[in-house]
Each structure stands twice: as structure tokens, then as C-alpha cells.
A protein has these predicted regions:
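N-terminal "arm"/small-domain region of PLP-dependent enzymes with the aminotransferase-like
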Residues: 2, 6, 10-78, 209
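Active-site-proximal loop->helix
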Residues: 127, 145-152
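Conserved PLP-anchoring active-site segment centered on the Schiff-base-forming lysine
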Residues: 124-143
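Short, structured coil segments at secondary-structure junctions
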Residues: 131, 151-153, 207
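Active-site phosphate-binding strand-loop segment of PLP-dependent enzymes
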Residues: 57, 157, 161-214
């Protein structure tokens, strides 16, 4: 009985989504990812060649012959996947070697690999922040950053998109926090505009340092007749 009622309820919801034009149909790709691909859409129609403007394959590396050959060599030598997270069974030595090479190339203290940028954004804030800290993010940051912020215990706040005056107000407002972490995209994925990184860094450095007592609100004087 319950299963029947649940199925009917879900079917009604799906019907409403379709009627509103919001139901997403999958596209079946019959070719490697690239600037143009062979796509079957709608499902059941003959596949046709189309220009692909929506993939994250910006440099075309997913089907580059050298990348494909390296992936094939990795499968032959190490098999498919880790079969666990790295701290259970261990991590592959070739992963650690890649981290070392990236560290040398970037000139950083160390490097940590994640399976995707989504996973990296989901893991970084929780690891470095506590409930004594605050995250101050541009309101148009990527959804993966928003998800990562939700996992952290730190307080969340935002500033208007690329509005440095508003960011400074937020930094002043949160001077009582142990750490004030400013979060922004480098290139904003929806609009394509660039973050004002030099100015953001300058503001972050201006308000860096130990926590300070929050200044009292300004009192408003009243005029008397």
C-alpha cells in the first residue's frame, strides 16, 4: 500500500516537473568529448554531430592521444581505481609522485590530490576552520564552494559580487573572529568575469592578525527643537 502511494506521489511530482518544462532529458554521446561531438537527443533519435559548448574539457585533454595512452598505461600497471580512500588501504606511489611534481612546479609547501575540484572545495574549509572562524564569500561563488562552506563549522557570510567596499565592511564586522577567510572564484563560471584578486588580497592582509573586539555601533544623534 505504502509503495503504491509513494509511487503515485512521485509520479505526480514528475508530471508537474515535465509540465513546467523543467524535466531534464539525458543526451547520449556516441563519440569522445571534444569541440564537436556525436549526440543522440532526444533519446531514440539518430545521433548527429553538434558543436559542444558546455563541457569542462576546456583544453581538449580528455581525448588527447598522449593523455589516453598514459591512462591506458596506468590501467595496465595498476588496475582500475584505488578500491578505497587513501587512508584505508593506502595511496598509490604514482599519486604521491604527481603531488611532488606539482609542488615543485607550483613552488608550494606540498600538494594534495582530490578526484575533482568539487571534492576539493567540499573538503578544504572543514579541515582548516572551526566555529571560532568566519567565511566571507562572494555571492556568486560556484555551487561546490557553497556546499563546502555548509560542511564547515565556521560562521558564513557573503559580500556583494566584486564589491570591495562591501567586503571591507564585512571584514570590519568580523574582527572578533579568530580567522576571517575571504572566498572567491578566480574566474566566475556563470558570467566569465574575473575576481579582483590583487585588491582582495590587499584587503585580507589589511585586516589580518589576531581577533579584535568588535567596535560598538555608531550612535545616532537626535535633533531636539
Amino acid at each position: 500500500m505504502f509503495a503504491t502511494e509513494a509511487r503515485q506521489r512521485y509520479q505526480q511530482e514528475l508530471t508537474g516537473i515535465r509540465d513546467a518544462g523543467l524535466f531534464k532529458e539525458e543526451r547520449y554521446i556516441h563519440s569522445p568529448q571534444g569541440a564537436d561531438i556525436e549526440v543522440e537527443f532526444p533519446a531514440g533519435d539518430p545521433a548527429r554531430r553538434v558543436i559542444n559548448l558546455c563541457a569542462n574539457n576546456y583544453l581538449g585533454l580528455s581525448s588527447h592521444p598522449e593523455v589516453v595512452a598514459a591512462a591506458r598505461a596506468g590501467l595496465d600497471s595498476r588496475g582500475y581505481g584505488m578500491s578505497s580512500v587513501r587512508f584505508i588501504c593506502g595511496t598509490q606511489d604514482i599519486h604521491r609522485e604527481l603531488e611532488r611534481r606539482l609542488t615543485s612546479f607550483l613552488g608550494t609547501e606540498d600538494t594534495l590530490l582530490f578526484p575533482s575540484c568539487m571534492d576539493a572545495n567540499g573538503g578544504v574549509f572543514e579541515a582548516i576552520l572551526t566555529d571560532q572562524d568566519v567565511m566571507i564569500a562572494d555571492r556568486l561563488v560556484h555551487a561546490s564552494i557553497v556546499d563546502g562552506m555548509r560542511l564547515a563549522k565556521a560562521q558564513q557570510d557573503t559580500f556583494k559580487h566584486s564589491d570591495l567596499a562591501h567586503l571591507e565592511e564585512k571584514l570590519q564586522e568580523h574582527q572578533d573572529k579568530r580567522q576571517r577567510l575571504v572566498i572567491t572564484d578566480g574566474v566566475f563560471s556563470m558570467d566569465g568575469d574575473l575576481a579582483k584578486l590583487d585588491e582582495i588580497v590587499a584587503l585580507a592582509e589589511k585586516y589580518a592578525g589576531p581577533p579584535r573586539a568588535r567596535p560598538p555601533p555608531r550612535s545616532r544623534s537626535r535633533r531636539t527643537r
